[in-house]
Amino acid sequence: TPIGQNFIQGDAAAMPSGDSNPYGRGYTQNYTASESHHGVGLMIVSDKAGPITQTNLNATYAYHLTLTSKLNLAVGVSAGVNHISLNTAEITLENPLDPAIANGNNSQWKPDLGVGIWAYSANYYVGASVQQLLKQNLYFNSSSNITQSQTVPHYFFTAGIKLPMSDDVALLPSVLVKVIQPVPTTFDLNLKMAFRDIFWLGGSYRKDDSFGALAGINISSGINVGYSYDFTTSALRTVSNGTHEIVIGILLNNRYKVRCPQHGF
């Protein structure tokens, strides 16, 4: 995992609605505390969709256990807070005294907790995680009895494998399944082709939502850059022409000069 990885995502960058486009920004910082055992990190993610802004601040810890000479197991936990705010100035109401937000609690802090497990080797991985384990009530008014919503756990399952085609070229298929009740289960199917673990090209499919094209390169043992473009296939295609994503990874204190990601994952 890149250390000091910046990630910026505009989920609907092509929507012709100016500054109201959904927007996300994330920052992660990871540090290995000792040889092959402990890892700690910091994660900051901010998302904006219309008048609602959500910011997550989480500290993370993972323990890596060597199962065999080729297989490792990591178990991790993240804990922190989630800040949700509503900018009522961006809302036009038919009734200015709408009880749903009048005299409301427009800024809220909620606890956040997540756990995950990941088995990995040089050529494959499989993992599962849960985010938002702590269900929290959300409301933007002075009385929680008027309108109230609740956060629900997000379940993720992922797996991938590296299939060498030659000494220089490898295919890397992977899948990500997302389960969030009560919405339908969705999944991503991805396929990358890597050349000497230096650069890669690929594509992805997200169920009932989009197709994507991606490319990336390890510029050095400390820096890698990735780019992807999503072609929307859902009903949003009438107002969205696609989404651009750029990822920059920086690996600090890389004493062994390994490329990151080392195995193309």
Residue ranges of model-derived segments:
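Subset of outer-membrane beta-barrel
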Residues: 1-265
